[in-house]
Amino acid sequence: GDTFDLGDVTIEVIHTPGHTRGHSIFLVPEAKTVYLGDIELTGFGPYYGDAWSSLIDFEKSLELCRNIDAENFVTFHHKWVITGRADFINQLDNFEKVINDREEKMLDFLKKPRTLDDCVAHRFVYRPHVELAFADSVERRCAEQHLNRMIQDGRVQSAEHKRFVSI
């Protein structure tokens, strides 16, 4: 990525796609500080529900973040500043675990054949009572990404009538 030289300080731009195609984080090596943007470490977990989001890219970006040499980690939402690498790694682990949790819940739900619409209605990202205009489209994009991966991994298969079932 690019590096901005501001005199006594440099800012390194590190491309971390997943949340969006162009998502980047900004490392200030002299301050051992990284601005994580929308890698926000909340209990909601990674958001990869936009049209240009990618679950696979997000996971690669989280691995990249795990290896950044920093002591201060600044998020865009809710957490703000996390001081100390051990605390950051713990929060990153919890944040990343949400992906696995969603997938495990989906596998359990797919013990009976279900359609994509069934998965959307069940809500694996948002809680069932959350009424947001965009919630169904986010659920659909996230479910499609998980289903595609689980089909490729052999954990889910297509069934009749456009249904999916866990193996």
Q: Which residues make up each language-model segment?
A:
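Alpha-helix-centered segments that form part of catalytic cores
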Residues: 1-9
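Generic structural signal for secondary-structure transition and capping sites
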Residues: 3, 70, 114-115
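Flexible, active-site-adjacent loop/turn segments at secondary-structure boundaries
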Residues: 4, 97, 136
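Conserved hydrophobic "DFG−1" position in protein kinase catalytic cores
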Residues: 6, 26-28, 158, 166
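Metallo-beta-lactamase
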Residues: 10-103
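C-terminal regulatory/interaction regions
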Residues: 105-167
